[in-house]
Every structure is written in C-alpha cells, then in structure tokens.
Amino acid sequence: EDAQQQFSDALEQFTHLMNYDGGELQDVYEELKEQYEESNQAAAEVTKRINKVESVADALFDEWETELDKYTNPGLRRESASKLQDTQRRYQSLVKSMRKAEAKMSPVLSALQDNVLYLKHNLNATAIGALQSEFNGVKNDINQLIAEMNNAIKESNAFISSMRD
C-alpha cells in the first residue's frame, strides 16, 4: 500500500511539474479511485461490525450458559437451555449469512482495484508520452543554447584575435 501511495504521489508530482492534464481519462481515474477507496473503507467497516456482533454474542451466550446453573427450578432451567440452543442455532445461521455476504465483497473490490490500476497505468503511459514532447522541447532549448554559446565563443575569439593584431 505504501508503494502504491508512493507511485500515486510520483504521478501527482509529475502532473504538477509538467502541467500535465490527463483530460477525461484522468477525471475518470480520479473518480474511480475515490470510489474504490470509499468502498474499501466500507468493506473494512462491515468486517469490523460483524466481528463486534460475534464478540457481543459470544459474551451473551457465555453468560447465559453460566447462569443456567443458577436455576433452582429444573423445568425453567430446561426451557432456558432449550431456548439457548435454539437462539445459538439461529445466531449461527445469521453469522453464516453475514460472512457469506462479506466474502462477496472481496472479488468486487478486486475487480474495482484492477480497473483503477488499469486506468492509472493508461494515464501513466499517456503522461510518459507527454515526456517525449517535453524532452524534444528541452533538446531544442539545449541545441539553441549550444548554438548561442558557439556564437559567443566565435565572437570572443574574433575579439581576442583583433587585440593581438
């Protein structure tokens, strides 16, 4: 994740440095990236909530089981124990459904992440293409500077020659 952030930062720095505008591709990428990050956070929150439900339910069931021994009336104890088993069965079914729904999030997030990466890499390819035109501009500037320097050298050589005469 740190590498992904670093890579993203590199593209951002390049964009600012080069005044590069990725146009619609960049807009779509940024929107999709934001949606992915929000979806990823929401999925993590769902997992946290399911874990909390399990933790609370475990504590409640432990307490219920412990308190069964406190009954003095065997009939009430049997009825409560039966209700405990029934409730645990229904709870297990509920948790199974929640975990099944949770498991379906991962492939969807993976597909969304793949799309985000694909758009990003296409954006990077386009940005690298922009580097070529920047390189050509720098190369022209360098050639012009070299020509001006050669001209200045010729002029200074001519001046030095005229001083010797």
Residue ranges of predicted features:
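N-terminal Sec/ER secretory leader and immediately downstream segment
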Residues: 1-48
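A structural signal for long alpha-helical coiled-coils and helix-turn connectors
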Residues: 11, 15-18, 65-68, 72, ...
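Short, charged, amphipathic alpha-helical segments
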Residues: 26-34, 77-85, 129-136
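Extended amphipathic alpha-helical interaction segments
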Residues: 49-129
